[in-house]
């Protein structure tokens, strides 16, 4: 994750936003695939998940929140793992927990929630391909195992299934709003980077 990079509000971050969130006086950020954000000031962070996984982290007493959007289960054997840790579920969890630890926040003081991991193939291919490649299921499995390794049990989960999700994460309160996507709405393409929004 990079040092404080200020993200700008864009149309993707507010599209499909629940009405009760429109009036909040917060920065609106869009989290792309392979990115992670740690926000020391409250922000409303939106992302769209298919088979990808997001984990939200919230520290209630400091109102610090973090989230990542990972597309692959493990960094093991990945040539770009050091450059793009938030692309991989296991490395993203370790990276965000490391960022909290550098601020004196222990893993067991965080409220953690797990999202995503859908199997979004078309119905005709689902049965034939699920046993071969279920990246979403594997992403969820690795997320749970990695969190467990740090002694963390997710407070809530909205995972698996056959539809993508749009998430809105309030980093100051830890609240997450989820909207299931219609099967015709693909996740949005994006760059593979990590960012750290600390100020």
Curated annotation (Swiss-Prot):
User: Is Hydrolase among the key words of this record?
Assistant: yes
Spell out the disulfide connections.
Answer: none
Matching InterPro entries: CheD-like_sf, Chemorcpt_Glu_NH3ase_CheD, Cytotoxic_necrot_fac-like_cat
- Broad EC category: hydrolase
> In its keyword annotation, does this UniProt entry include Transferase?
no
Per the record, the domain of life is: Bacteria
Q: Which CDD domains match?
A: CheD
Q: Name one GO molecular function term.
A: protein-glutamine glutaminase activity
Keyword line:
Chemotaxis, Hydrolase
Q: Name one GO biological process term.
A: chemotaxis
> Which Pfam family, an example, fits this chain?
CheD
EC number(s) per entry: 3.5.1.44
Catalytic reactions of this protein: L-glutaminyl-[protein] + H2O = L-glutamyl-[protein] + NH4(+)
Protein family membership: Belongs to the CheD family.
Q: What does this protein do?
A: Probably deamidates glutamine residues to glutamate on methyl-accepting chemotaxis receptors (MCPs), playing an important role in chemotaxis.
Q: What protein name applies here?
A: Probable chemoreceptor glutamine deamidase CheD
């Amino acid at each position: 994750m990079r040092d404080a990079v200020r993200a700008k509000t864009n149309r993707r971050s507010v599209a499909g936003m629940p009405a009760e969130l429109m009036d909040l006086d917060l920065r609106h950020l869009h989290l792309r695939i392979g990115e992670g954000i740690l926000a020391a000031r409250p922000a409303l962070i939106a992302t769209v998940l298919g088979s990808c996984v997001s984990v939200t982290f919230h520290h209630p007493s400091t109102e610090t929140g973090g989230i990542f959007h990972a597309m692959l289960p493990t960094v093991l054997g990945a040539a770009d793992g050091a450059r793009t840790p938030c692309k991989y579920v296991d490395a993203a969890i370790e990276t965000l927990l490391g960022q909290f630890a550098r601020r004196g926040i222990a893993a067991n003081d965080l409220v953690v929630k797990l999202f995503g991991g859908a199997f979004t193939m078309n119905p005709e291919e689902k049965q034939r391909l699920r046993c071969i490649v279920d990246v979403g299921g594997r992403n969820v499995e690795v997320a749970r195992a990695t969190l467990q390794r740090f002694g963390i049990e997710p407070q809530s989960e909205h995972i698996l299934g056959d539809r993508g999700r749009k998430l809105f994460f309030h980093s100051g309160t830890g609240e997450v709003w989820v909207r299931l996507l219609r099967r015709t709405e693909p996740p949005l393409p994006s760059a593979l980077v990590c960012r750290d929004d600390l100020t």
